[in-house]
Amino acid sequence: MKKTDWSQPLRNRLAEGYFPKMIEFINQTYQEGKIYPPENQIFRAIELTPLAQTKVIIVGQDPYPQPGKAQGLAFSYPATFKVNRPDSIVNIQKELREEGFSKEDSDLTAWAEQGVLLLNAVLTVPEFASNAHAGKIWEPLTDEIIKIASDDERPKVFILWGGFARKKAKLIDGSKHLILEAAHPSPLSASRGFFGSHPFSKTNDFLVQTGQSPIDWSK
């Protein structure tokens, strides 16, 4: 993990033995099998989006388990893959168009660089084994990231899609921040509350109201 302004707050909050256990888990799992994302991208979300620049947090579940597709950013998918994009990112693009934003590629790096923390609750996954690392090591870390963002004085937007992410609402101070909850953008649930929820325009409205620059969701 590269040193960022997330580093010290995390070390202050997590149990003393957590980081050695985390390093042991990373070393062991990456030696034993095919794990995604690449090891140097595990912490890419907090490396690309410092706490001081974080304005929006989108919570995902875990990385894409297919080769070459996980980028260390929730929901982001390499632009080099032009076909067979995950249905969730396709539905996110549909909602963006509905809200007047044109986002043709599926790589969300530019969002991260604007202050959108794209945080998976579980940061690694074995090949073709979605959610297999849930409950292993990552949730104490990612829960603390959410709490640190909530405790920060600048108002933020927390976007929680689906039942899994919505459970994280209890970690957030709703009196200070905007919490946007909706159905997950997967095909199973997108038509039951994700489409038409307007998370992107609502986010920008809140940012402007709190004296912050809006996100260019088209990037």
UniProtKB/Swiss-Prot annotation:
Alphabetized UniProt keyword annotations: Cytoplasm, DNA damage, DNA repair, Hydrolase
Main location: cytoplasm
Active site location: D62 (proton acceptor)
Entry's Gene Ontology BP terms: base-excision repair, AP site formation via deaminated base removal
Subcellular location field: Cytoplasm
GO molecular function terms noted in the UniProt entry: uracil DNA N-glycosylase activity
Superkingdom of the source species: Bacteria
Keyword Manganese: no
Xref: NCBIfam families: PRK05254.1-1, PRK05254.1-2, PRK05254.1-5, ung
HAMAP family cross-referenced by the UniProt entry: UDG
Function in brief: Excises uracil residues from the DNA which can arise as a result of misincorporation of dUMP residues by DNA polymerase or due to deamination of cytosine.
Entry protein name: Uracil-DNA glycosylase
Name of the encoding gene: ung
